[in-house]
């Protein structure tokens, strides 16, 4: 079968609400490498950002007059490049066959999307950024271990949502080393590929337990952040899931899925039949 990536859930949401905030969406990743959880409508991965310090600066530190001038010049240059590309495509249009015209239409769509993003950046460039009490040093990338690092990520995500700097965030948690949880002897990846070895399963469970403790702390942060009409958690849909239901077997069925907040009437833990059940996409559509 011809299977290819298409648009991810977060980018569909960003299309609906991304124009209302300084940052259309954030694709964050603590796992390193080139992995991204976000994909545009052409199936191209959206670049991730794994640097908390640069994200903090982007969201909360105003640029100097010189920096703003350079950014304005960069955006103007971007418009100029797009204008040149549009002119070149127009001159080629009459010379192309049907299949090439289809490719050209994709390029024209990309140009229009880039133009929208440039205009959005221009609209925000001179507006003051929100001020937060937490200093940049709290979100230093020099965290002691993955547990500390993960909690710093959650704190930064909470600030981004609280200040309405963005309304769409994806955070890839990734694998961990054995630092941060006492008496762990093997890494997260090794433990996840346990092959039903009881000792590895026990260590894997301890990694998972710490992940969920950190996640629960993040939900507590959202609950404690009060807003008109409720808490930040009441006004935020938080989805935690995985691409694997059984990492040891690389099985992608029976995925663990956790939905919090958003004003839903949650019913606690729901276990569905592994064969006769509902598509996970039903939940995604409800979120949108």
For every predicted segment, state its role.
Residues 1-288:
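Ligand-binding pockets and gating/stacking loops
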